[in-house]
């Protein structure tokens, strides 16, 4: 009889009404790193490192790029006959040049301050080509005989389309004095050149005068050129060389030319009608008939992520380049689902779950919440208010990081001439150093934010637990695993009052007091003495004691 009484008392305790505080868990295998830990499994995570591109050259915000194909910038501007498709070009978003374009300076030579000119082009979006000195205006000089087999067109000798190679006429080369006044409202890009013959015989054959010069002057330019006559190896079948120059002629300024030989005169100039962010990008890609906000030499990026690891050189509204291979931001909680335990026919609601033992996969409509068990049944209920606040907080954090990193900028490689190799090497080392620092900062930012996010979730669960504990006080017992065992009956209405913060402590305090006194000890008459048994709150302990007494 005593055994039956004791067993009945224990089972009654096991069936006491309970409420637990816990958090959401799922089948996610997403892992993040924090300052303190690596490979922490979380319920939700967001990759913030873009690793993909489309492998194409695209329009940038609806404006097509100027893809020079087999032409170089020099070949385009001077008018290499093989670059006729670029005689007139519309507005461009950026310029694409191959690493080694075939159609460059067809007549061998050099383009003075070429790298500086390219840098200038990275701030221009549109040229308008205008004629400044008509080719037919050179009545005292031959303007059509200045051609070369090095610049063929349709099987015949030709020359650059935008400049005129002036040759002697009737064995005379009168001194040239020409001026052009820029009456436009825009700046003007003006190009000209000088021919360096192979020997003195070629000099007099072309220009009659054995000693010649070219003078060029503007309000800011004072240049005097003389030909360098020397024996050279043949390039493109030519022993001679040409050297080209450029300047920006401001509105209302004039450019003055004077020469008695070797002069390559401008016929056309480029009116700079639109300035803006552009770039000259080295790429072998083809046009993909697509649109993007961010272009790299490897392809276009269409992403809202704040970082990418595709290529350090970009144009447009791009994520920041980092050298990292993985940047994952925690947005959810630590994911440690409880192990599913077999349910016995004993009226228990299953594994007691809490924020200490593990998360609940059964709670799918919130990050934090409750599990209750009473005579009416058991179930999960998310705490919508704390969940929504947490979602808003994490979302704002992610958006803030993205907004800070997604800024309009361009990072295109700078070009240096042969005399500036040490500067180029120093520049590369500095850029590599900046990338290393930025990569470190990005990785550290992610580690710190992940640590804060997981701590934030832990704190929210603890706050929810304290909210319940302060309401129940001594009307329930803390089981130490995120659960409370009521000392009174708590139906579904009572459970809801605990969840929404309206639990009426005085209403249940008397019933709870009597229950506490009832279970404070058990009288064991069979041995004629009384002992106080510690009643364990866990399911396993209760069942083990029941089996021992019954046996």
UniProtKB/Swiss-Prot annotation:
One of its GO terms (biological process) is virion attachment to host cell. InterPro entries: Capsid_hemagglutn, Hemagglutn_HA1_a/b_dom_sf, Hemagglutn_influenz_A, Hemagglutn_influenz_A/B. Palmitoylated. In natural infection, inactive HA is matured into HA1 and HA2 outside the cell by one or more trypsin-like, arginine-specific endoprotease secreted by the bronchial epithelial cells. One identified protease that may be involved in this process is secreted in lungs by club cells. Its main location: virion. Residues 1-16 form the signal peptide. The chain crosses the membrane at residues 531-551. Glycans are attached at residues 26-27, 39, 181, 302, 500. Pfam families: Hemagglutinin. One of its GO terms (cellular component) is virion membrane. The record marks 346-347 as: Cleavage. It is found in: Virion membrane; Host apical cell membrane. Major glycoprotein, comprises over 80% of the envelope proteins present in virus particle. The extent of infection into host organism is determined by HA. Influenza viruses bud from the apical surface of polarized epithelial cells (e.g. bronchial epithelial cells) into lumen of lungs and are therefore usually pneumotropic. The reason is that HA is cleaved by tryptase clara which is restricted to lungs. However, HAs of H5 and H7 pantropic avian viruses subtypes can be cleaved by furin and subtilisin-type enzymes, allowing the virus to grow in other organs than lungs. Binds to sialic acid-containing receptors on the cell surface, bringing about the attachment of the virus particle to the cell. This attachment induces virion internalization either through clathrin-dependent endocytosis or through clathrin- and caveolin-independent pathway. Plays a major role in the determination of host range restriction and virulence. Class I viral fusion protein. Responsible for penetration of the virus into the cell cytoplasm by mediating the fusion of the membrane of the endocytosed virus particle with the endosomal membrane. Belongs to the influenza viruses hemagglutinin family. This is Hemagglutinin. It comes from Influenza A virus (strain A/Hong Kong/212/2003 H5N1 genotype Z+). The gene is HA.
């Amino acid at each position: 009889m005593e055994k039956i009484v004791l067993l009945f008392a224990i089972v009654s305790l096991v069936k006491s009404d309970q409420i637990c505080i816990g958090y959401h868990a799922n089948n996610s295998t997403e892992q993040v790193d924090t300052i303190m830990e690596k490979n922490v499994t979380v319920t939700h995570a967001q990759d913030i490192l873009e690793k993909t591109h489309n492998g194409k050259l695209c329009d940038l915000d609806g404006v097509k790029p100027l893809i020079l194909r087999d032409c170089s910038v020099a070949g385009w501007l001077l008018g290499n006959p093989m670059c006729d498709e670029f005689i007139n070009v519309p507005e461009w978003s950026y310029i694409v040049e191959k690493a080694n374009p075939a159609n460059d300076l067809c007549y061998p030579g050099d383009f003075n301050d070429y790298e500086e000119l390219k840098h200038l082009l990275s701030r221009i979006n549109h040229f308008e080509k205008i004629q400044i000195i008509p080719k037919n205006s050179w009545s005292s000089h031959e303007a059509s005989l200045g051609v070369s087999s090095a610049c063929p067109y349709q099987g015949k000798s030709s020359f650059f389309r935008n400049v005129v190679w002036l040759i002697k006429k009737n064995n005379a080369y009168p001194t040239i004095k020409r001026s052009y006044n820029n009456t436009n409202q825009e700046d003007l890009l003006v190009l000209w050149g000088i021919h360096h013959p192979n020997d003195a015989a070629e000099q007099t054959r072309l220009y009659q005068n054995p000693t010649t010069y070219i003078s060029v002057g503007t309000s800011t330019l004072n240049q005097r050129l003389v030909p360098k006559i020397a024996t050279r190896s043949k390039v493109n079948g030519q022993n001679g060389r040409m050297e080209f120059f450029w300047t920006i002629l401001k509105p209302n300024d004039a450019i003055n030319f004077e020469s008695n030989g070797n002069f390559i005169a401008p016929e056309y100039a480029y009116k700079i009608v639109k300035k803006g962010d552009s770039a000259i990008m080295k790429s072998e890609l083809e046009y993909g008939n697509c649109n993007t906000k961010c272009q790299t030499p490897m392809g276009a990026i269409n992403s809202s992520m704040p970082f990418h690891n595709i290529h350090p050189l970009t144009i447009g509204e791009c994520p920041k380049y980092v050298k990292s291979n993985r940047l994952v931001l925690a947005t959810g909680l630590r994911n440690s689902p409880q192990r599913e335990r077999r349910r016995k026919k004993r009226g228990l609601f299953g594994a007691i779950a809490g924020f200490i033992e593990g998360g609940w996969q059964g709670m799918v409509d919130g990050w934090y919440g409750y599990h209750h068990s009473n005579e009416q049944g058991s179930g999960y209920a998310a705490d919508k208010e704390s969940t929504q606040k947490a979602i808003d907080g994490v979302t704002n954090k992610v958006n803030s990081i993205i907004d800070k990193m997604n800024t309009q900028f361009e990072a295109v490689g700078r070009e240096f001439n042969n005399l500036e190799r040490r500067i180029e090497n120093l520049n590369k080392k500095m850029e590599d150093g900046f990338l290393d620092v930025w990569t470190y900062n990005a990785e550290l930012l992610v580690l710190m934010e992940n640590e804060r996010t997981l701590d934030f979730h832990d704190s929210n669960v603890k706050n929810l637990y304290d909210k319940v504990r302060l309401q129940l006080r001594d009307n329930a017992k803390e089981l130490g695993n995120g659960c409370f065992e009521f000392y009174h009956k708590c139906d579904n209405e009572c459970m809801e009052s605990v969840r929404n913060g309206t639990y009426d402590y005085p209403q249940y305090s008397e019933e709870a007091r009597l229950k506490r006194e009832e279970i404070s000890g058990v009288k064991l008459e069979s041995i004629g003495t009384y002992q106080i048994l510690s009643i364990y709150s866990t399911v396993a302990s209760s069942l083990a004691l029941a089996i021992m007494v019954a046996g």
